[in-house]
């Protein structure tokens, strides 16, 4: 989501984010009187009453995976919502009504802050939504995002035309005006800061600990429930409620889609041998995978793929997720 700064704000704590009037901030998460936001390459907390934001009707921050399914099953194909990830603060998931069910995709971000599901990348969620209104979000079927019934769709154009004359809008939203007028009176004064500001800094929400302290890896990128169909393996899947998705990004999706048809023996000579220590337990769910426990040392035979490596342990050869291990010298 995007928001526009109504006033200048100077950070007084290390976890706060400074900005100027008119700056456009990306909103990452919500906590009482503060938002976690991003501006440029910086992230931090900003007071809600210093910015202007109106969430599009398709954004439901607190909705769970199960609630999203219940909401969308009664809708037409293509209806969707975007919600905050319950297991990964600051991330988002998109739930889409397909013909037979509701599918959930993890919205990924690259190191430049762009959002993506497949190969196309966008500077904001609104741009992503706008793109998939006219381009299929599914790689198997033609499914376009929509939040209006076919009956209402005919009235949409006129409504948007009228709105477009009233001021700037956030690209990709469904007609809701969410940017404030830039004609703010010069006599306006910044509001009082939320209480946390007078306590030196806002209290951040509980985030996941560092990877080495986790029982399970952060932003798990392995599909544990292998009954999902092939399209879900190809996209970036939601990991909420214990369901882990690939989340591999545009550079890695193709590799993951074809890796199930790759014989690990054929990969043995592709890379040099080295060693890696397991950071987490990994359960092999398919014959071509290599299971291990945290702390075990795996012989790495091929590390050319950024997401899945080939290794050997206890005389067994197979594939395993690269982010479950740490390279080591031996």
UniProtKB/Swiss-Prot annotation:
Q: What does the UniProt entry say about where the protein is found?
A: Nucleus; Cytoplasm; Endosome
Could you tell me the superkingdom of the organism this chain comes from? Eukaryota
Q: Can you supply a Gene Ontology BP term from the record?
A: signal transduction
What residues does the SH3 domain cover?
A: 1-56, 271-330
Question: Which residues does the annotated region (Disordered) include?
Answer: 143-244
Which residues are annotated with the PTM Phosphothreonine? 262
Q: Where is the composition biased (Basic and acidic residues)?
A: 144-164
Q: Which residues carry this modification: Phosphoserine?
A: 187, 236
Task: Tell me where it mainly resides.
Answer: nucleus
Start-end of Low complexity biased regions:
209-222
Region forming the signal peptide: none
Q: Can the keyword Phosphoprotein be found in this entry's annotation?
A: yes
| InterPro entries attached to this UniProt entry | GRAP2_C_SH3 (IPR035646), Grb2-like (IPR043539), SH2 (IPR000980), SH2_dom_sf (IPR036860), SH3-like_dom_sf (IPR036028), SH3_domain (IPR001452)
Residues carrying N6-acetyllysine: 106
One GO CC annotation, please?
Answer: nucleus
Q: Where is the SH2 domain positioned along the sequence?
A: 58-149
- In its keyword annotation, does this UniProt entry include Ubl conjugation? no
Q: Which UniProt keywords apply?
A: Acetylation, Cytoplasm, Endosome, Nucleus, Phosphoprotein, Repeat, SH2 domain, SH3 domain
List modified residues, type Phosphotyrosine: 45
Which GO terms fall under molecular function for this chain's record?
Answer: phosphotyrosine residue binding
Q: How does it assemble?
A: Interacts with phosphorylated LIME1 upon TCR activation. Interacts with phosphorylated LAT and LAX1 upon TCR activation. Interacts with SHB. Interacts with PTPN23.
Which family is this sequence assigned to? Belongs to the GRB2/sem-5/DRK family.
The record's function comment reads: Interacts with SLP-76 to regulate NF-AT activation. Binds to tyrosine-phosphorylated shc.
Concerning PANTHER family, the annotation shows: PROTEIN ENHANCER OF SEVENLESS 2B
Quote the protein name from its UniProt record.
Answer: GRB2-related adapter protein 2
- Tell me the organism: Homo sapiens (Human)
* Gene encoding the protein: GRAP2
């Amino acid at each position: 989501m995007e928001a526009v700064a109504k006033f200048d704000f100077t950070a007084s704590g290390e976890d706060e984010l400074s900005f100027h009037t008119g700056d456009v901030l990306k909103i990452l998460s919500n906590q009482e009187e503060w938002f976690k936001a991003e501006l440029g390459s910086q992230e931090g907390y900003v007071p809600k009453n210093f910015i202007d934001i109106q969430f599009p009707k398709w954004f439901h921050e607190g909705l769970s995976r199960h609630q999203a399914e219940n909401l969308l099953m009664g809708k037409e194909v293509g209806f969707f919502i975007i919600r905050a990830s319950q297991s990964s603060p600051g991330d988002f998931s998109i739930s889409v009504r397909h013909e037979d069910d509701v599918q959930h995709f993890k919205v990924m971000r690259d190191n430049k802050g762009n959002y993506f599901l497949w190969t196309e990348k966008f500077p904001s969620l609104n741009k992503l939504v706008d793109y998939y209104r006219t381009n299929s979000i599914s790689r198997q079927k033609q499914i376009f995002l929509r939040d209006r019934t076919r009956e209402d769709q005919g009235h949409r154009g006129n409504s948007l035309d009228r709105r477009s004359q009233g001021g700037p809008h956030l690209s990709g939203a469904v007609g809701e005006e969410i940017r404030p007028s830039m004609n703010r009176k010069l006599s306006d004064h910044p509001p009082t800061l939320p209480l946390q500001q007078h306590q030196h800094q806002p209290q951040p929400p509980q985030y996941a600990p560092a990877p080495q302290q986790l029982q399970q890896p952060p932003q798990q990128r392995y599909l544990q429930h292998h009954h999902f169909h092939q399209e879900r393996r190809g996209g970036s899947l939601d990991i909420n409620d214990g369901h882990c998705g690939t989340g591999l990004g545009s550079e890695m999706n193709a590799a993951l889609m074809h890796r199930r048809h790759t014989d690990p023996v054929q990969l043995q000579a592709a890379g040099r041998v080295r060693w890696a220590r397991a950071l987490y337990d990994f359960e092999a769910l398919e014959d071509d995978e290599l299971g291990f426990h945290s702390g075990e040392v795996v012989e790495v035979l091929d590390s050319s793929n950024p997401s899945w490596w080939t290794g050997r342990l206890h005389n067994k050869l197979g594939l395993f997720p690269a982010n479950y291990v740490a390279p080591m010298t031996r």
